[in-house]
Amino acid sequence: MSRFIDRVVLHVSAGKGGNGCASVHREKFKPLGGPDGGNGGRGGDVVLEVDGNVHTLLDFHFHPHAKATNGKQGMGSNRDGAQGDDLILRVPDGTVVLDEDGRILADLIGVGTRFEAAQGGRGGLGNAALSSKARKAPGFALLGEDGVERELVLELKSVADVGLVGFPSAGKSSLVSVLSAAKPKIADYPFTTLVPNLGVVSSGDTTFTVADVPGLIPGASDGRGLGLDFLRHLERCAVLAHVVDCATLDPGRDPISDIDALEAELAAYKGALSGDAGLGDLADRPRIVILNKADVPEAAELAEMVTPDLEARGWPVFTISAVSREGLRPLTFALAKLVADYREAHPKAEPKRQVIRPVISNENSFSVVADPEIPGGFIVRGTRPERWVRQTQFDNDEAVGYLADRLARLGVETELVKQGAEPGASVTIGNVSFDWEPQTPAGVDLTRTGRGTDPRLDQVERIGATERKHASRIRRGLEGLDPEDQ
């Protein structure tokens, strides 16, 4: 029998982008073939997708690490590297995705709903894509970016219309088994139910789902018993039904005190989805009271005695027996009406396949702040500057010059001057620190060797066919040198 796991910590790693290729086209009779290095392939994404055939997070419990494939490196002849394959992770309907700080990133409801858990790194550009009028034959390419790597918390919260709450052995599982075709484990000892059981109930034209939550005890909201682990499964329920054991022989227990104790736990529990689900806190949900085990004579008398007090609270009260099936028909109609009223008040949006992606910030923005650890130093923060640094081959002078041009065009140099940076000041971008030297406007060469130039392009004097034929005959000794060449 498979274990029910409803909370896991998942470490996801997207694929790394492939490096670009620095290559020059070589072909017979084409001395100036030009750059032909292809771009690197994009790394694969890690995607969570709701699958109707998955009902637990068990797979992630045993395999908590998920990594997508990397993109391939670009090649010559303008051949781009292959993209990495996306890794699709199947999750149950009702999975909530949280970050390390407990913030909700996505609430996955509906088969086919997707969430991009980790984005693959961009592939680096090859030198063919980097060529321009000023840089006709770049001798460098850009490196691929690393994929996003993060830890996520996955929590499964059952998607049900009605949640059954009650003390252990109150008969919740028995009630689900007679209302629906579900076959939960039933026995005469406490905490028989260790996992939520879902059942589908049909009443007239209304079909709804019922969730049997493991038994609650006082202190469940503080972690006593099993309640803290399973109270989350009530967060999506539109209607809460108290299932009360009227035949209990435990001292100090009666239907009124049981309901009061459970109400205190529901009021104390603050679910993460209460506001997002649009249902309010658990204490605000519609209630219905089910007095169970009326087939026992003493239980039937007790149910009749406490019914007026419970009805005075404004809650519908039903006396039933899950064993003899007494009172099930009116109970089913009442539950169906409560669910139908809720659906009418909260119309469901048109079903569609949703894809949830992280919000992309403004990539052009950056900031320059003083370095608190290095006097006179500065730290540059921003999406683009940090990405450009990660893409740069610092052992290639042309690549470093290209990075300087990009930073100048973005306005980083201007901002450093405004902040009072002196020549030679330490500047940190990402994980790279360097001594800053002011440059002239972007595109003007300050290095000894030109950035991205091909010396063959400076050969303006061409040798004609006659001269090449004469030189060939001289090499073979068929002719002598001209007097002016001697």
Curated annotation (Swiss-Prot):
<dbReference type="InterPro" id="IPR036726">
    <property type="entry name" value="GTP1_OBG_dom_sf"/>
</dbReference>
<feature type="binding site">
    <location>
        <begin position="292"/>
        <end position="295"/>
    </location>
    <ligand>
        <name>GTP</name>
    </ligand>
</feature>
<dbReference type="GO" id="GO:0005525">
    <property type="term" value="F:GTP binding"/>
</dbReference>
<keyword id="KW-0963">Cytoplasm</keyword>
<feature type="binding site">
    <location>
        <begin position="191"/>
        <end position="195"/>
    </location>
    <ligand>
        <name>GTP</name>
    </ligand>
</feature>
<feature type="binding site">
    <location>
        <begin position="212"/>
        <end position="215"/>
    </location>
    <ligand>
        <name>GTP</name>
    </ligand>
</feature>
<feature type="binding site">
    <location>
        <begin position="321"/>
        <end position="323"/>
    </location>
    <ligand>
        <name>GTP</name>
    </ligand>
</feature>
<keyword id="KW-0342">GTP-binding</keyword>
<feature type="domain" description="Obg">
    <location>
        <begin position="2"/>
        <end position="159"/>
    </location>
</feature>
<dbReference type="InterPro" id="IPR006169">
    <property type="entry name" value="GTP1_OBG_dom"/>
</dbReference>
<dbReference type="InterPro" id="IPR027417">
    <property type="entry name" value="P-loop_NTPase"/>
</dbReference>
<dbReference type="GO" id="GO:0003924">
    <property type="term" value="F:GTPase activity"/>
</dbReference>
<dbReference type="GO" id="GO:0005737">
    <property type="term" value="C:cytoplasm"/>
</dbReference>
<dbReference type="Pfam" id="PF09269">
    <property type="entry name" value="DUF1967"/>
</dbReference>
<dbReference type="InterPro" id="IPR036346">
    <property type="entry name" value="GTP-bd_prot_GTP1/OBG_C_sf"/>
</dbReference>
<dbReference type="InterPro" id="IPR015349">
    <property type="entry name" value="OCT_dom"/>
</dbReference>
<feature type="domain" description="OCT">
    <location>
        <begin position="358"/>
        <end position="438"/>
    </location>
</feature>
<dbReference type="InterPro" id="IPR006074">
    <property type="entry name" value="GTP1-OBG_CS"/>
</dbReference>
<dbReference type="InterPro" id="IPR045086">
    <property type="entry name" value="OBG_GTPase"/>
</dbReference>
<dbReference type="GO" id="GO:0042254">
    <property type="term" value="P:ribosome biogenesis"/>
</dbReference>
<feature type="region of interest" description="Disordered">
    <location>
        <begin position="462"/>
        <end position="486"/>
    </location>
</feature>
<dbReference type="InterPro" id="IPR014100">
    <property type="entry name" value="GTP-bd_Obg/CgtA"/>
</dbReference>
<feature type="binding site">
    <location>
        <position position="173"/>
    </location>
    <ligand>
        <name>Mg(2+)</name>
    </ligand>
</feature>
<keyword id="KW-0547">Nucleotide-binding</keyword>
<comment type="subunit">
    <text>Monomer.</text>
</comment>
<keyword id="KW-0479">Metal-binding</keyword>
<keyword id="KW-0378">Hydrolase</keyword>
<keyword id="KW-0460">Magnesium</keyword>
<dbReference type="GO" id="GO:0000287">
    <property type="term" value="F:magnesium ion binding"/>
</dbReference>
<protein>
    <recommendedName>
        <fullName>GTPase Obg</fullName>
        <ecNumber>3.6.5.-</ecNumber>
    </recommendedName>
</protein>
<dbReference type="Pfam" id="PF01018">
    <property type="entry name" value="GTP1_OBG"/>
</dbReference>
<feature type="binding site">
    <location>
        <begin position="166"/>
        <end position="173"/>
    </location>
    <ligand>
        <name>GTP</name>
    </ligand>
</feature>
<comment type="function">
    <text>An essential GTPase which binds GTP, GDP and possibly (p)ppGpp with moderate affinity, with high nucleotide exchange rates and a fairly low GTP hydrolysis rate. Plays a role in control of the cell cycle, stress response, ribosome biogenesis and in those bacteria that undergo differentiation, in morphogenesis control.</text>
</comment>
<dbReference type="InterPro" id="IPR031167">
    <property type="entry name" value="G_OBG"/>
</dbReference>
<dbReference type="Pfam" id="PF01926">
    <property type="entry name" value="MMR_HSR1"/>
</dbReference>
<feature type="domain" description="OBG-type G">
    <location>
        <begin position="160"/>
        <end position="340"/>
    </location>
</feature>
<comment type="similarity">
    <text>Belongs to the TRAFAC class OBG-HflX-like GTPase superfamily. OBG GTPase family.</text>
</comment>
<feature type="binding site">
    <location>
        <position position="193"/>
    </location>
    <ligand>
        <name>Mg(2+)</name>
    </ligand>
</feature>
<dbReference type="InterPro" id="IPR006073">
    <property type="entry name" value="GTP-bd"/>
</dbReference>
